[in-house]
Amino acid sequence: MITNYSEGNSLSTIPVEKNDDILSMEEILEISGLDMMQGILDGIYPPAPISKLLNYNVHAVEKGKVVFRGEPNLASRNPMGTLHGGWYGTILDSAMACAVMTTLPKGKIQTTLEFKVNIIRPIPADVEVDAIGTVEHAGRSTGVAVGRIVDVASGKLYASASTTCIIMTPKLK
């Protein structure tokens, strides 16, 4: 729970998740990355807990492209009342890494090696945005993607980003 200490009022309550609310590594390795992301979109598989925390969801999926739609909440604001830079980074990392995931066959996973975010302008309160991740390269050992955050209503660009992901074949015990 996030609390306003000066007032003693609760700003929002973040539910505590159980491990049952995410796919196991065994389950992930049995499906392609595209099937996993499509399953999350369709409600067959659970979304990543971070998306609930930061108020965004998978909105569209195709091979090499994923769109997350969200609206930053009050808990995502910094002490000055503007949107914390970590929100931009998190939703863009999700969109770009998941776009790379859509290119992977079953038995493969990926994770972010590095990413860079360029915040162009602040996202105002009560604005719904799309974070669009698009793959530029999907190789055997790395994937490269770019991302952007745009206003759903106007198309205004708020941020752009790029990432490199490592592609792995995990060995289960």
How would you label these PLM feature ranges?
Residues 1-173:
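Terminal targeting signals and extreme-terminal segments of soluble enzymes
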